[in-house]
């Protein structure tokens, strides 16, 4: 028997006898043999004991490769399963996943595993790891595993999907599991790991299935990498808008009342209102006419627009009014703004016609996808549509983009990039069928970006079905890539709804419709801001801009109220903390609530008409006249406003 192994650099090695991936790594270099954790054979991940006996392309996976981390984490998940099953014999095991985020294992028992039990399980894992116990890679008859898992409905369901009479499996002592591509040969190679958290997860991700308990963990080859990852996770936890929203009392969601339906508490509503007022003022100044339109619309409108055909799964069921009329909660605002355009006869003199709305919409999101304010079932979109003549498209596009950039500057959004999204030329069936339109509109978008001198990436297959678009992708504080703003060219809806305007020639012409969102939905945008600012909102957005603390309520309460009234009269959001608590506690509470300014008022301040000032995040105390403080906070607010 003679065969060749082709390595990633193109070199070949010839062998007369079969050998394992581990043998091959050792043959190439002793150091590679020590670092090897798995191999890729013809593109498929295989364990070190996998036998090579025919011509193959092989890459050795080491502890320095990303896929090496996946193997390590899969092994840690396997050891967790073995330990958990030993600790809780009645435990049922579901899916296990290892990836760049760590690993997780779905479990189920009458009394689910609680987060407080993780240290005990971690200690048991450490014992198994310290012993360096062998992990056997075995082939087991499927019938044998069926008998083993006969009382575990989840494993039985997974096993039923495995083809063939034998199953590729792994053993650790008496414990057996399957579904792993490759594991390390012994537990001692798991250097650094941590069990992180528990959460509920539907079996196979379907809300109609039972809720299981998902155990999360991670693993690394180096202690420094684990420490850095845990630090990163702590930062993410501290920035999570759901945590901050709870701690600062901004919003809440009660599944008993309605999952994905947030309640805005007074402080959260104040932030949202500040954002909404800013956006409306910005848009009105830019020539938009703000409107209100109904959240319900006749289903026929969405059939005409194509939304019913393309987005039915994301829409709530229609409501039968009993007289043949079917009403639908709107998933998008564009058909509503089309009605605004159609309500009057339009002339070329009316164009560009800019319509904007903070429009409430509803999307049928599955419960498993819901998350705080980021994924909800009811949302308010900062939506706008401009109706233009064909020769106005490029100019209007540039104008919209300029507005977006100005808004980004005011909110200090700097980490973003532009993506031009085109139709897929190899799969044109799912797009509006007009090759000339697509070619023309894509050139318009590209030309507008080039004229502005902006860098962008181009992505085929990312366009909407009715036209190409510009997506502005931002990085969230948690490191996720998210679409913040969108500008879309639409030649289809004006055609479907029969939109026309009278041109200079007295003839009817079809307008082009530009869809645009400056900051997306209020819910997602405020989640984004909460995480970027870590709850410490700039003064112009802060729900409470100044907290007044009288040293003694009886002696200084009247002066505190006078200062409050003076600030409130000028439009600042200010509160007096007159609770019967120690002053130090109230100052710490003001810092915990991330109030930009804390004003302490005592005898000296009352006599001199001054305030003792502390900025959020500092211990420095500054004495200022009330007038000087008013000038300071006024300048602070304006420094974040649209005038700058």
Swiss-Prot record:
Query: What EC numbers are recorded for this enzyme?
Result: 6.1.1.3
The residues that the entry says bind Zn(2+) are 334, 385, 515
**What PROSITE patterns is this protein classified in?**
AA_TRNA_LIGASE_II, TGS
- The question of whether Nucleotide-binding is a record keyword is answered with yes
Q: Which domain of life is it from?
A: Bacteria
Q: Tell me the InterPro entries matching this sequence.
A: aa-tRNA-synt_IIb, aa-tRNA-synth_II, aa-tRNA-synth_II/BPL/LPL, Anticodon-bd, Anticodon-bd_dom_sf, Beta-grasp_dom_sf, TGS, TGS-like
Q: How is the cofactor bound?
A: Binds 1 zinc ion per subunit.
Query: In what residue span(s) does the TGS domain sit?
Result: 1-62
What family is it from?
A: Belongs to the class-II aminoacyl-tRNA synthetase family.
Q: What is this protein called?
A: Threonine--tRNA ligase
Species the sequence originates in: Lactobacillus helveticus (strain DPC 4571)
Which gene name belongs to this protein? thrS
């Amino acid at each position: 028997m003679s065969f060749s192994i082709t390595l990633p650099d193109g070199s070949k090695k010839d062998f007369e006898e079969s050998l394992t991936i581990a043998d091959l790594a050792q043959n190439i270099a002793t150091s590679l043999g020590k670092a090897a954790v798995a191999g890729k054979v013809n593109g498929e991940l295989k364990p070190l004991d996998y036998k090579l006996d025919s011509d193959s392309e092989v890459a050795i996976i080491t502890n320095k490769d990303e896929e090496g981390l996946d193997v390590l984490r899969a092994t840690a998940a396997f050891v967790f399963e073995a330990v958990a099953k030993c600790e809780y014999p009645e435990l049922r095991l579901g899916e296990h996943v290892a990836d760049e985020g760590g690993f997780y294992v779905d479990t189920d028992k009458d009394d689910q595993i609680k987060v407080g039990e993780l240290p005990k399980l971690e200690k048991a894992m450490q014992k198994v790891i310290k012993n360096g116990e062998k992990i056997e890679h075995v082939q087991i008859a499927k019938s044998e595993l069926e008998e083993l898992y006969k009382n575990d409905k989840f494993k039985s369901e997974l096993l039923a999907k495995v083809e063939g009479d034998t199953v590729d499996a792994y053993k650790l002592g008496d414990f057996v599991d399957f579904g792993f591509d490759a594991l390390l040969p012994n537990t001692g190679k798991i250097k650094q790991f941590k069990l992180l958290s528990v959460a509920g997860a539907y079996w196979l991700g379907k809300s109609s299935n039972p809720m299981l308990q998902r155990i999360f963990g991670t693993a690394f080859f180096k202690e420094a990498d684990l420490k850095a990852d845990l630090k990163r996770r702590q930062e993410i936890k501290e920035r999570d808008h759901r945590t901050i929203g709870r701690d600062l009392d901004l919003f809440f969601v009660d599944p008993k009342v309605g999952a994905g339906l947030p309640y805005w508490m007074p402080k959260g509503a104040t932030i949202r209102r500040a954002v909404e007022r800013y956006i409306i003022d910005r848009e009105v100044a830019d020539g938009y006419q703000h409107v209100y339109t109904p959240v319900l619309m006749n289903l026929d409108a969405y059939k005409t627009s194509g939304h019913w055909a393309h987005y039915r799964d994301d829409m709530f069921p229609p409501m039968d009014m009993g007289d043949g009329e079917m009403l639908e909660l709107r998933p998008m605002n564009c058909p509503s703004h089309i009605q605004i355009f159609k309500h009057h006869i339009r002339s070329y003199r009316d164009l560009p016609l800019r319509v904007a709305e903070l429009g409430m919409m509803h999307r049928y999101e599955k419960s498993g996808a819901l998350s705080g304010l980021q994924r909800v079932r009811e949302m308010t979109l900062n939506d706008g549509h401009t109706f233009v003549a064909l020769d106005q498209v490029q100019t209007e596009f540039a104008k919209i983009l300029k507005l977006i950039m100005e808004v980004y500057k005011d909110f200090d959004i700097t980490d973003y990039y532009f993506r031009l999204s085109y139709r897929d030329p190899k799969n044109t069936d799912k797009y509006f069928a007009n090759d000339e339109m697509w070619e023309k509109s894509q050139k318009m978008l590209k030309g507008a970006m080039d004229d502005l001198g902006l860098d962008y990436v181009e992505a085929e297959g990312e366009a909407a079905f009715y036209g190409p678009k510009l997506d502005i992708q931002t990085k969230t504080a948690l490191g996720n890539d998210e679409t913040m703003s969108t500008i879309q060219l639409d030649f289809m809806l004006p055609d479907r709804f029969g939109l026309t305007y009278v041109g200079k020639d007295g003839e009817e012409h079809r307008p082009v419709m530009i869809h645009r969102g400056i900051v997306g939905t209020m819910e997602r945008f405020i989640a984004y801001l909460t995480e970027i600012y870590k709850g410490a909102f700039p003064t112009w957005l802060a729900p409470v801009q100044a907290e007044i603390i009288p040293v003694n309520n009886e002696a200084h309460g009247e002066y505190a109220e006078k200062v409050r009234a003076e600030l409130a009269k000028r439009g600042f959001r200010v509160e007096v903390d007159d609770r019967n608590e120690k002053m130090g506690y109230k100052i710490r509470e003001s810092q915990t609530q991330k109030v930009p300014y804390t004003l302490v008022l005592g005898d000296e301040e009352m006599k001199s008409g001054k305030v003792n000032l502390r900025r959020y995040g500092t211990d420095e105390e500054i004495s200022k006249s009330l007038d000087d403080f008013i000038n300071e906070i006024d300048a602070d607010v304006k420094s974040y406003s649209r005038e700058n």
